[in-house]
C-alpha cells in the first residue's frame, strides 16, 4: 500500500501546485451524501486556510444540465473547477467543455489516467489499483490532497466519509492508513462500545430510532421504554455504564438472537460533534433534506448549523422508522424492491438487505430514481450493482456507482421493465 501511496503522492503534489498557482476563484462541486459533504468540508477548510477565493455547490448528480450551467460560468470567469465524489464518470463532458479542472473521485473512471490533458488532473484510486468501493472514499481522496498541505487534522472528516460510505467494517487499504494516521496525530480515539451510546439522548429514544441495528419490536418510544424498565435499566439514562451494557446486550441477544452490530468501534474525533458515527448520520440527514449549506457548516463546526443538524437528524430518524414500518417489499427471482419516499430509499434498502439485493425507487415528475444496495456477502458471490444499474442506458436513462451500492434514473413508464432486466443481470452475476 505504501508503494501505491507514493505513486498517488506524485499526483497530489501536482494538484497542490495547480491550486497554489491559480489566482482566480475556485469552483468546488461535490455530492449531497455524507461522503460528498465530508469532501466539501475538507476542501472548504483547505481552501480557506490557503486564502483561496472559492464558491462551493452541492449537487445530487453531475448531470449534463449541471455541466451546461458550469460551462456558462467557465466562459465568463474561467475558474478552477474541483469536482469531488464525481467527475470520473463524466470526464468526457468535462473535456468537451474545456474546463480547467481537478477531479477527486473514487468511482470507476472512464479514462484511467491522472493527467488527462494540460488542464485536467484526475486523482482516482482505481488508476493505482486501489478499490474505491472498499479501500478509500471520496473524502479520503480529498484528504490525501489536504495532507499535501500539511492539514492532517482534516483526517477526521475523511473518517466520517468512511463511515458514511460503509467502508469501515473492516478498514482496508488507504482507509486503514488514514485512520491510523489520525490516531498517530491524536485526532481520533477508538473505543469499543454499545451502539446506543453514540447519540447522547435518553437510551429509550436511542433504541427506538436506531436503524443499525433495526429491531422492529422496539421501534417505538413506548416499547423501548418498557423493555428497558423490564430488565432493570433506567430508560432516561443518556449513557450506559458497563453493567447496564452487559444487561442490555444479554437481554437483546436472548430475545432477538439474529440481531448483529450491537457493539461497534466508536470513533471519537477532534470535532464539535465528537462521535464520527453521529456526525455521519447528521450529514446524511441534512443532505437528504436538501440542507446542503447546513451540512458544509456542520463540517466547518458552525454552532448554529450543528444545532439545526441535530434537530433535522431526529426528525429524519423518526420519519425513517415510520417509513420502514410502511415499506412493502416485493420480490423477483433475485432482488427485492419497493417504492418509497425521496431521500430515504437508499438508507432503507441498506437496512433491509439480507439474502438478496434490495432496490428502492421513487417517482419524481416523469422519472424514477433508484437506489440499490447489497452487502459484502453478496459482492463476494459476484454481485456488482454498478454493472447491473448501468443497464439503465438500455432504457434511455443512466446508472452506476459501486459494486455494493449504486443508483439509476429511468423514465417512470420503464420501471417494471428496468427492474426485470436488473433482476436478470443480478441472477447471472450470482450464478457465476
Curated annotation (Swiss-Prot):
GO terms for biological process: DNA recombination. Gene3D superfamilies: 3.10.310.30, 3.90.1640.30. It comes from the Archaea. Pfam families: DHHA1. Disulfide bonds: none annotated. GO terms for molecular function: nucleic acid binding; single-stranded DNA 5'-3' DNA exonuclease activity. To M.jannaschii MJ0977. This is Uncharacterized protein MJ0831.
Amino acid at each position: 500500500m505504501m508503494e501505491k501511496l507514493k505513486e498517488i503522492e506524485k499526483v497530489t503534489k501536482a494538484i497542490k501546485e495547480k491550486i497554489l498557482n491559480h489566482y482566480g476563484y475556485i469552483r468546488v462541486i461535490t455530492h449531497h451524501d455524507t461522503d460528498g459533504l465530508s469532501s466539501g468540508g475538507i476542501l472548504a477548510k483547505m481552501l480557506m486556510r490557503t486564502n483561496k477565493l472559492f464558491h462551493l455547490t452541492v449537487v445530487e448528480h453531475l448531470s449534463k444540465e449541471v455541466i451546461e450551467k458550469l460551462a456558462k460560468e467557465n466562459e465568463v470567469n474561467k475558474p478552477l473547477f474541483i469536482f469531488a465524489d464525481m467527475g470520473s464518470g463524466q470526464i468526457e463532458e468535462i473535456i468537451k467543455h474545456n474546463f480547467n479542472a481537478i477531479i477527486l473521485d473514487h468511482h470507476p473512471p472512464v479514462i484511467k489516467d491522472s493527467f488527462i490533458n494540460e488542464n485536467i488532473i484526475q486523482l482516482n484510486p482505481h488508476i493505482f489499483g486501489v478499490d474505491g468501493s472498499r479501500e478509500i472514499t471520496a473524502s479520503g481522496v480529498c484528504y490525501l490532497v489536504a495532507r499535501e498541505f500539511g492539514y492532517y487534522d482534516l483526517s477526521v472528516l475523511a473518517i466520517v466519509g468512511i463511515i458514511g460510505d460503509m467502508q469501515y467494517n473492516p478498514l482496508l487499504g488507504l482507509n486503514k492508513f488514514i485512520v491510523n494516521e489520525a490516531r498517530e496525530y491524536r485526532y481520533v480515539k477508538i473505543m469499543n462500545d454499545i451502539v446506543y451510546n453514540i447519540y447522547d439522548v435518553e437510551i429509550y429514544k436511542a433504541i427506538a430510532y436506531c436503524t443499525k441495528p433495526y429491531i422492529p419490536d422496539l421501534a417505538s418510544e413506548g416499547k423501548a421504554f418498557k423493555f428497558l424498565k423490564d430488565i432493570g435499566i433506567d430508560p432516561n439514562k443518556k449513557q450506559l455504564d458497563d453493567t447496564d451494557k452487559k444487561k442490555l446486550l444479554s437481554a437483546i441477544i436472548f430475545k432477538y438472537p439474529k440481531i448483529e452490530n450491537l457493539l461497534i468501534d466508536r470513533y471519537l474525533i477532534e470535532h464539535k460533534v465528537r462521535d464520527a458515527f453521529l456526525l455521519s448520520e447528521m450529514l446524511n440527514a441534512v443532505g437528504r433534506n436538501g440542507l446542503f449549506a447546513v451540512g458544509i457548516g456542520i463540517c466547518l463546526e458552525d454552532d448554529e448549523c450543528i444545532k439545526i443538524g441535530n434537530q433535522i437528524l431526529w426528525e429524519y430518524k423518526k420519519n425513517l422508522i415510520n417509513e420502514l414500518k410502511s415499506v412493502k417489499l416485493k420480490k423477483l427471482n433475485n432482488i427485492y424492491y419497493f417504492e418509497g419516499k425521496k431521500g430515504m430509499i437508499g438508507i432503507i434498502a441498506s437496512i433491509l438487505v439480507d439474502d438478496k439485493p434490495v432496490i428502492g425507487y421513487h417517482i419524481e415528475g416523469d422519472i424514477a430514481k433508484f437506489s440499490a444496495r447489497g452487502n459484502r456477502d453478496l459482492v463476494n458471490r459476484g454481485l456488482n450493482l454498478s454493472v447491473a444499474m448501468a443497464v439503465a442506458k438500455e432504457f434511455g436513462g443512466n446508472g452506476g456507482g459501486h459494486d455494493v451500492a449504486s443508483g439509476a434514473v429511468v423514465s417512470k413508464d420503464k420501471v417494471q421493465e428496468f427492474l426485470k432486466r436488473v433482476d436478470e443481470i443480478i441472477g447471472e452475476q450470482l450464478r457465476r
